[in-house]
Regions:
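Glycine-rich phosphate/diphosphate-binding loops that line cofactor/substrate pockets in enzymes
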Residues: 135-150, 171, 247, 282-287
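Short acidic, glycine/serine/threonine-rich loops at helix termini
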Residues: 100-104, 162-167, 190-196, 266-269, ...
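Gly-rich Lys/Arg/Thr-decorated short loops/hinges at beta-loop-alpha junctions or inter-strand turns
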Residues: 110-125, 222-226
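Loop/turn positions that initiate beta-strands
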Residues: 83-91
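Gly/Ser/Thr-rich loops at beta-strand to alpha-helix junctions
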Residues: 94-95, 154-162, 185-188, 262-263, ...
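Long terminal accessory regions outside catalytic cores
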Residues: 1-83
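C-terminal functional extensions of proteins
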Residues: 204-254, 259-290, 295-364
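Active-site histidine-anchored catalytic micro-motif
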Residues: 150, 172, 177-223, 292
Length: 364
């Protein structure tokens, strides 16, 4: 099996319905963070806007945001970030009536029916066969390693298993990880595993509780705060394994978003939810593949800020692949209806998932 990137089919704007469509209307923002009445809200699909007779694509889109027309460019801006004077696109139709066109079928494959491998609106559960999904994902990762940007969104479950930590470390070291987004817990327990060989006080191989082990993650946080940064903590304590260690060693960017339940937190964790969301969106702006693992909150947040397409530097429009993996069917199904070429789901234990992928890619 060899991965081939689907071709994007742009709308034919020579058709009368596009030629006859009006230019988009805009209205200014009067109050910071408040969109004007009848603002247009974006989806994950490619959306075109008619400006001065030309249909323009909003290149860096996301769900549930406004479109600002600025110097002939279309900027997709979260409503909370709107500023007075911003010219916001108006209209709530999507077939050209308001100069707005939503293009949901840009990646169709001619000669293929809707049982295509990338049509995801179908039930998937623990009983689904995922052999083909793993094969497709591994081919995709081989392609993205060279041609794209793979961002991993991870919950703390990885840190509780020695094999999963080793597999993810190998993925980083072999170039399959270009960005990591997580919370305080993943980083804390991964560093705990490196320093004490425990996670929440349990040995990460035998799962046996260690004496006073419930102090271990708190000690890690305390020591890291004493060091002043995670990289300095790694150096000060001669950390030589784990997910966070490998990301730091290989200069893989990390975004750690805090929450109200965090201990500590570690230095570098972003405590302001909206600053964290902004940092996450900055990381996924040029991502071409996003893999979300065992974290419902971060998965939904990432899915909402990630469109189903990416515009490359040369103007090529390609699909953006999103995978969500969790042992809970409810979690993965939260993103199942985001659309074709948008979310692929696998219901499984994430420790087993990463080990299968790493072995399939022959990095362990």
């Amino acid at each position: 099996m060899s991965f081939k990137l689907p071709v994007y089919h742009a709308p034919d704007f020579s058709q009368p319905k596009f030629q006859d469509a009006p230019n988009v209307q805009t209205a200014p923002v009067l109050q910071a963070g408040v969109a004007p009445e009848n603002y247009h809200s974006t989806s994950m699909f490619p959306e075109y806007f008619k400006v001065n007779g030309q249909w323009l694509l909003a290149k860096e889109s996301r769900m549930d945001s406004s479109v600002v027309l600025q110097d002939g460019q279309l900027l997709v801006v979260e409503n909370r970030n709107l500023q007075p004077g911003d010219q916001v696109v108006l209209g709530r139709t999507e077939q050209g009536e308001d100069g707005i066109y939503l293009h949901a079928n840009g990646f169709y494959e001619e000669g293929r029916d809707h049982d295509d491998q990338f049509v995801f609106r179908q039930g998937r559960s623990r009983e689904t066969s995922y052999a083909r999904d793993y094969d497709e994902l591994m081919e995709l990762l081989r392609y993205e390693k060279v041609h794209g940007k793979v961002v991993w969104v991870m919950g703390p479950a990885f840190a509780f298993d020695s094999d999963a930590r080793a597999a993810m470390q190998a993925m980083v070291e072999n170039g399959y990880v270009h960005g990591l987004m997580a919370g305080n817990a993943l980083a804390t327990h991964d560093l705990e595993g490196a320093l004490f060989h425990t996670a929440l006080g349990q040995d990460i191989y035998t799962q046996r509780p260690q004496p006073n082990g419930h102090y271990n993650h708190l000690d890690v946080i305390n020591l890291a705060r004493q060091s002043g940064s995670i990289p300095q903590f790694i150096q000060d304590h001669n950390i030589q394994d784990g997910i966070i260690y490998s990301c730091v060693a290989h200069h893989v960017p990390i975004v750690l978003a805090g929450s109200i339940r965090d201990d500590g937190p570690l230095p570098g964790v972003i405590g302001d939810a909206y600053q964290a969301a902004g940092a996450m969106r900055d990381m996924v702006r040029d991502a071409t593949c996003v893999i979300c693992l065992a974290t419902m909150l971060h998965t939904i947040a990432t899915g909402n800020m990630t469109p189903c397409f990416r515009v490359l530097a040369d103007g090529t429009i390609r699909p953006l692949y999103i995978y969500t993996v969790d042992a809970d069917e409810f979690v993965v199904n939260k993103l199942l209806d985001r659309g074709s070429l948008s979310a692929k789901t696998i219901v499984t234990n994430v420790q087993d998932f990463i080990t299968i992928v790493a072995r399939g890619l022959k990095v362990i």
